UniProtKB/Swiss-Prot annotation:
Protein source organism: Bordetella bronchiseptica (strain ATCC BAA-588 / NCTC 13252 / RB50) (Alcaligenes bronchisepticus)
Protein's name according to its UniProt entry: Ubiquinone biosynthesis O-methyltransferase
Alphabetized NCBIfam families for the sequence: UbiG
HAMAP family named among the record's database cross-references: UbiG (MF_00472)
Tagged with keyword S-adenosyl-L-methionine: yes
Amino acid sequence: MTTATQSSAPGVNVDQAEVEKFSALAARWWDPESEFKPLHAINPLRLGWIQETAGSLSGKRVLDVGCGGGILSESMAVAGAQVTGIDLAEKSLKIARLHGLESGVKVDYRAVPVEELATEQPGQYDVVTCMEMLEHVPDPASVVRACAALAKPGGWVFFSTLNRNPKSFLFAIVGAEYVLRLLPRGTHSYDSFIKPSELAASARQAGLEPTGMRGMEYNPITQVYSLSANTSVNYLMSTRK
């Protein structure tokens, strides 16, 4: 995997510029017409694929790594899971907690690095999700290892990120950020994109076995997202411990 170059402090796997970027947008997390519109649009697809793969979430302990404002966390809690969401952007967590109070959905939000949580709660979660997060940290392989450590034996770990190739640069950066303006400019750095083969290798090294992949595609004419077999740009990967 390629890695970002900035970290807030030695030993902390975080790019402070990324934290500040999402903190600045925190108040708009739950506005479906904001910069987070794509996340609202793809969330039913992500949740559906998780349930299709791992089965019912009812009563299961679930960890959402890089939860942001809680879009996926809340939907998994509504599906019956006992959800913990972690993120290092305090402003995003504040919005997540506030929205949880307003919606009556219970999620335990914590500002803690996933590596630190892995030492506190190893093998405690039936399902771990790490969506649209790996491309925003200096050492994605470290996050993969921590996610693996947090999962119970037989537990599921789900990742989603961006492939690294000319098409993904054209679609995810030029198209999404500059032409269609689906995302703010500077949301992504091409050097931080991760090929499926790289993610699969990191997963196996961490004791996870990849079990499936799906691509996510956007139709600019219908403005609809869908899951597909095309993993050339956005993709999801399921793994099992």
